[in-house]
Amino acid sequence: MSEGIDIKELKRRMDGAVSAFKSDIASLRTGRASANILDPVTIEAYGSRVPLNQVANITVPEPRMLTVSVWDKSMVSAVERGIRESNLGLNPIVDGQSLRIPLPELNEERRKSLVKVAHDYAEKSKVAIRHVRRDGMDGLKKAEKDGVIGQDESRAQSERVQKMTDETISEIDRLLGEKEKEIMQV
């Protein structure tokens, strides 16, 4: 087979968009506690902003409770402040060198707004996947124009790129559907 584009590289980039989407939706709060909920939280520590998981250990002792064990006692108030200011709607309770974070029930309005955020993440990922497809198609057109591959080979590879794109976007839609169900579950 003639050289046109690196299909494996396109697949790797599309899979990267799916991984980023999985990471994004994992941080969305559902009815159950998950340490990923606190992924977006950053703390003012040692002169810079660092992710919470670099200054504390996060555990899930109960379905509606998170526990954050801060490694450095002097950081407890900074961790509490970071969680309160994170716009996650969480109110940590300081308990010595750790914080307990009860997760309130999600009301219908909050659930719908979380679903909307999940849809935004999905759309962002689909756009990234389409950019990868466009890069691949542009590469094929250039290779065909430069005489590196023939028209038939270009068409065959272009169909493979489109099929790969469709499958990857279907995967995003499937993951979105699962997350939506999880969020709306009461």
From Swiss-Prot:
Region (Disordered): 144-163
Pfam family name, one: RRF
Compartments, record wording: Cytoplasm
One cellular-component annotation, GO: cytosol
Keyword Cytoplasm applies: yes
Keyword flag Cytoplasm: yes
UniProtKB keywords: Cytoplasm, Protein biosynthesis
Domain of life of the source: Bacteria
GO process terms (BP): cytoplasmic translational termination
Gene Ontology MF annotations: ribosomal large subunit binding
NCBIfam families in the record: frr
Function: Responsible for the release of ribosomes from messenger RNA at the termination of protein biosynthesis. May increase the efficiency of translation by recycling ribosomes from one round of translation to another.
Xref: HAMAP family: RRF
Family: Belongs to the RRF family.
Record protein name field: Ribosome-recycling factor
Taxonomic lineage from the root: Bacteria, Pseudomonadati, Pseudomonadota, Alphaproteobacteria, Hyphomicrobiales
